[in-house]
Amino acid sequence: ISWPSYPGSEGIRSSNCQKKLNCGTKNIATKGVCKAFCLGRKRFWQKCGKNGSGSKGSKVCNAVLAHAVEKAGKGLIAVTDKAVAAIVKLAAGIA
């Protein structure tokens, strides 16, 4: 897996990441998960910099992890949406 290209200082911003993933637009409950993901992603890029070596070649900064972080966003939000929908359905059944 090749190291994903550095998204740039604007690209790693949590607000931009949230916009890209449409955080909380379909369901407010997903906003928290989305925000947490985007903040984690931002910290990852801040730590790992442009080439994945970071300071002292941190073990955190490897291509596999970076690739996973970039790909995880959409899947994470989709799973959360499903979970929220299930909870809402369940709550409606109880009420």
Swiss-Prot record:
It is found in: Secreted. Keywords: Cytolysis, Disulfide bond, Secreted, Toxin. GO terms for biological process: killing of cells of another organism. Disulfide bonds join 17-38, 23-34, 48-61. One of its GO terms (cellular component) is extracellular region. It comes from the Eukaryota. The keyword Mitochondrion does not apply. One of its GO terms (molecular function) is toxin activity. Its main location: secreted. Signal peptide: none annotated. Belongs to the worm cytolysin family. Permeabilizes a variety of cells. Forms large pores which allows the release of large proteins almost as rapidly as small organic molecules and inorganic ions. At sublytic concentrations, the toxin also inhibits protein kinase C and endogenous voltage-gated cation selective (sodium, calcium) channels occurring in the nervous and cardiovascular systems. This is Cerebratulus toxin A-III. It comes from Cerebratulus lacteus.
